[in-house]
Amino acid sequence: MANQPSAEELKKKLSEMQFYVTQDRGTEPPFTGRLLHNKRDGVYHCLVCDMPLFHSHTKYDSGCGWPSFYQPVSEEAIRYIDDFSHGMQRVEIRCGNCDAHLGHVFPDGPQPTGERYCVNSASLAFSDEKNGDQLKG
């Protein structure tokens, strides 16, 4: 993993919800994330380290309440960890660069992958490919 800022530095940089999600493996309430309904063309990055994670053309409305994607930008973008918390068996997804918690991946997504990367808006930043505008979840 790349050098990650200290917890103190991150607490200054991130909102309380962003810190909770990315550093404490938290989950934002469904249907509340700023990037859930974003339909612009561009790239979704890790909020903590700016690593590109997902292209907008892989985003879709799964109805689950969090931004959903069917494929990351590269194999290196995402780290996968078996998660047995809360009495469930899931696969946690983290940033492949800084290890920030992003969400979980499920095998119920659309083709071509059949996967649903269910990602907290609070873990993402978005860069608009047309005008360079930045949005943070």
Swiss-Prot record:
Cofactor note: Binds 1 zinc ion per subunit. The zinc ion is important for the structural integrity of the protein.
Keyword Membrane carried by entry: no
Cited InterPro entries: Met_Sox_Rdtase_MsrB, Met_Sox_Rdtase_MsrB_dom, Mss4-like_sf
Domain MsrB, first and last residues per copy: 7-129
Keywords (A to Z) from UniProt: Metal-binding, Oxidoreductase, Zinc
Keyword Plastid found: no
EC number in record: 1.8.4.12
GO biological process terms on file: protein repair; response to oxidative stress
Annotated Gene Ontology cellular component terms: cytoplasm
Binding site for Zn(2+): C46, C49, C95, C98
First-tier enzyme category under EC: oxidoreductase
Active site residues of this protein: C118 (nucleophile)
Catalyzed reactions per annotation: L-methionyl-[protein] + [thioredoxin]-disulfide + H2O = L-methionyl-(R)-S-oxide-[protein] + [thioredoxin]-dithiol
Cofactor: Zn(2+)
Pfam families for this protein: SelR
Gene3D superfamilies cross-referenced by the UniProt entry: Peptide methionine sulfoxide reductase
GO molecular function terms listed in the Swiss-Prot or TrEMBL record: peptide-methionine (R)-S-oxide reductase activity; zinc ion binding
NCBIfam families: peptide-methionine (R)-S-oxide reductase MsrB
PANTHER family (alphabetical): METHIONINE SULFOXIDE REDUCTASE, METHIONINE-R-SULFOXIDE REDUCTASE B1
Family in the record: Belongs to the MsrB Met sulfoxide reductase family.
Record HAMAP family: MsrB
UniProt-recorded name of the protein: Peptide methionine sulfoxide reductase MsrB
Species in which this protein is naturally found: Salmonella agona (strain SL483)
